[in-house]
Amino acid sequence: MLTTGGAGFVGSNLTMAPARSHPDSNVIAFDNLHRKGSELNLDRLAEAGVEFVRGDVRSPADLAALTPPDVLIECSAEPSVMSGADGDSSYLYETNLTGAYNC
């Protein structure tokens, strides 16, 4: 199982439950750690038996480096309503649209 955005609030919680209930399965959290605080979930993920892979959904090469999963949970996103308020919304579009397409 692969969860993109796996170190974020939603992604980490959705990833830990199956990892705990199926300890023999290969569960991976994939995240670029762009959002402040995401790194605080890494210890909890490791304790639950989740493998962490740092990568970016905007990069097809990062995704191609992974073994194709049986299950994909796509939680990567730029959720901030202020994203792009500075006049540059490229990160928002590249993550939320292109990133989801790449998955």
Predicted regions and their residues:
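N-terminal Rossmann-like NAD(P)+-binding domain of SDR-like oxidoreductases, especially those catalyzing
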Residues: M1-C103
